[in-house]
């Protein structure tokens, strides 16, 4: 969603808006591939690929901005509504397979469905409140940044805590990482050619977000490589993957 009315954009931005739209389309392709890959990987490995709370936060964001505060352009509507439909599949496989990962915590294992419902409701309320506070155009941007950081932290922690690579793959990591990374050049174009409407993209908060995102998601690839190597060198660790 554009944070400002595109009809008010300066001529300089309109000349390069196709580049920003291309970045948005590539983002949609990357995340679509990631969602499809997560569904397939979850069914194959009988687990969930995305950490639970980030998954609920992401699903709540899709609900909020695909239905309640729908995007304005046809491209954005298609990208995010298709993302919501695929995310339903991701949620289904997570709910189905999550109990297997929580045998060590019976209280959590017995109440996983309730946890999913409460988490989605809680995150959805946060997204809606933020949209009402600052407007849906700016709210979707800031809440998406929060979702991304939670996803990056959650994915890294899940990989390290599990100690195995079941539910993870280089394809899932790269499609997620690249699907989000490609929005950085989009934001640079918006800030460069339409600065008055995108001042926040030059703020310390935004620069911090991009930096932390690069560090966390870049670290995930390295950690996955290390875990895979550890599984190959230690038969006991390799059995945990099965």
From Swiss-Prot:
Biotechnology remark: Diterpenoid pyrones display various biological activities and higginsianin A shows anti-HIV activity.
S-S bridge residues: none
Membrane-protein topology: Multi-pass membrane protein
GO BP, sorted A to Z: terpenoid biosynthetic process
Membrane-spanning segments: 16-36, 51-71, 78-95, 114-134, 141-161, 169-189, 207-227
Cellular component, GO annotation: membrane
Known EC number: 4.2.3.-
GO MF annotation list: lyase activity
Pathway terms, separated by semicolons: Secondary metabolite biosynthesis; terpenoid biosynthesis
Primary enzyme class: lyase
InterPro entries xrefs: PaxB-like
Superkingdom of source: Eukaryota
Subcellular localization(s) per the UniProt record: Membrane
One Pfam short name: Pyr4-TMTC
Keyword list, A-Z: Lyase, Membrane, Transmembrane, Transmembrane helix
Annotated function: Terpene cyclase; part of the gene cluster that mediates the biosynthesis of the diterpenoid pyrones higginsianins A and B. The first step of the pathway is the synthesis of the alpha-pyrone moiety by the polyketide synthase dpchA via condensation of one acetyl-CoA starter unit with 3 malonyl-CoA units and 2 methylations. The alpha-pyrone is then combined with geranylgeranyl pyrophosphate (GGPP) formed by the GGPP synthase dpchD through the action of the prenyltransferase dpchC to yield a linear alpha-pyrone diterpenoid.
Family listed: Belongs to the paxB family.
Listed name of the protein: Terpene cyclase dpchB
Organism: Colletotrichum higginsianum (strain IMI 349063) (Crucifer anthracnose fungus)
Taxonomic lineage: Eukaryota, Fungi, Dikarya, Ascomycota, Pezizomycotina
């Amino acid at each position: 969603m554009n944070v400002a009315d595109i009809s008010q954009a300066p001529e300089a931005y309109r000349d390069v808006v196709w580049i920003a739209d291309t970045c948005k389309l590539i983002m949609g392709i990357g995340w679509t591939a990631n969602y499809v890959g997560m569904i397939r990987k979850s069914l194959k490995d009988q687990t969930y690929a995305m950490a639970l709370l980030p998954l609920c936060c992401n699903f709540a964001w899709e609900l909020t901005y695909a239905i309640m505060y729908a995007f304005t352009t046809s491209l954005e509507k298609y990208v995010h509504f298709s993302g919501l439909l695929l995310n339903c599949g991701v949620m289904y496989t997570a709910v189905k397979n999550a109990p297997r990962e929580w045998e060590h915590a019976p209280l959590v294992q017995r109440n996983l469905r309730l946890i999913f419902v409460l988490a989605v409701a809680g995150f959805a309320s946060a997204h809606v409140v933020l949209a009402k506070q600052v407007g849906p155009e700016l709210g979707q941007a800031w809440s998406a940044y929060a979702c991304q950081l939670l996803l990056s932290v959650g994915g890294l922690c899940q990989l390290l805590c599990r100690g195995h690579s079941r539910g993870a793959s280089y394809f899932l990591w790269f499609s997620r990482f690249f699907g989000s990374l490609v929005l950085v050049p989009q934001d640079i174009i918006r800030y460069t050619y339409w600065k008055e409407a995108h001042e926040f993209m030059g703020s310390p908060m935004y620069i911090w977000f991009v930096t932390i995102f690069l560090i966390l998601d870049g670290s995930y690839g390295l950690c996955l490589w290390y875990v895979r190597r550890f599984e190959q060198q230690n038969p006991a660790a390799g059995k945990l993957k099965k």
